[in-house]
């Protein structure tokens, strides 16, 4: 896979934007951004080099999501979405992204952006499989149920909760369609290793409910 220079320029710009937002705080994240930019520059020098995204390139976003600062997390999720859309995530990195999203759901941070990222992650490729595929569905169900398990007097006053719930419901419908498409494909080629319908039902997803 050849990576075009304009795409690499966009990715470098995202890291610079995150670094600027950090100001003088979070030195490790700034250093991670600088390291990622250097790695991208090396790739820019030879466009024939295949870019197999690794921990160095997602690390700035991982660290930023751990800060619990909404502005940094929002920027990071948008950056991750671009990496996904450009087909730059390998399997290991994609699973790290799922774990990041899980932690954000647990802490009720940027839920709408999390749902958007899940959609991009599962509709752009077929890297996410097995337990991590089930986990993405569980996250969506949890956010959908948020409207029902939260005190209704609070829901009535907080439109954001209702918006999150309705967005999660729409996301679930879309992801179920994706899962069934994979099931149909698996019936043709059972060696692909995608999460089968039976395994999805049998999987102990209850342990992920928050």
Which residues does each predicted region cover?
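Flexible loop/turn segments at the boundaries of HEAT repeats in alpha-solenoid HEAT proteins
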Residues: 45-51, 85-94, 123-133, 178-187
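C-terminal transcriptional activation/regulatory domains of eukaryotic transcription factors
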Residues: 40-43, 47-50, 60, 66-67
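Eukaryotic cytosolic "membrane-facing" regulatory regions
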Residues: 29, 41, 45-46, 53, ...
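HEAT-repeat alpha-solenoid elements in large eukaryotic scaffold proteins
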Residues: 15-44, 70-82, 97, 107-121, ...
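Core helices of alpha-solenoid repeat scaffolds
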Residues: 4, 50-58, 90-99, 111, ...
């Amino acid at each position: 896979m050849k990576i075009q220079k304009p795409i690499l320029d966009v990715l470098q710009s995202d890291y610079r934007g995150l670094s600027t937002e950090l100001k003088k705080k979070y030195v490790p994240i700034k250093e991670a951004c600088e390291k990622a930019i250097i790695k991208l520059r090396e790739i820019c020098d030879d466009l024939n080099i295949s870019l197999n995204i690794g921990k160095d390139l997602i690390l700035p976003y991982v660290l930023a999501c751990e800060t619990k600062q909404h502005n940094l997390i929002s920027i990071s999720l948008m950056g991750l979405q671009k990496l996904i859309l450009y087909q730059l995530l390998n399997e290991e990195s994609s699973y790290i992204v799922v774990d990041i999203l899980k932690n954000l759901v647990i802490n009720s941070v940027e839920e709408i952006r999390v749902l958007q990222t899940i959609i991009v992650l599962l509709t752009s490729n077929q890297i996410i499989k097995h337990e991590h595929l089930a986990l993405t569905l569980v996250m969506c169900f949890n956010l959908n149920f948020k409207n029902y398990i939260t005190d209704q007097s609070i829901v009535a006053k907080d439109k954001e909760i209702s918006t999150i719930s309705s967005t999660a419901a729409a996301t679930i419908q879309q992801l179920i369609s994706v899962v069934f498409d994979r099931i149909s494909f698996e019936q043709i080629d059972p060696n692909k290793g995608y999460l089968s319908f039976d395994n999805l039902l049998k999987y102990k997803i209850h342990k992920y409910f928050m």
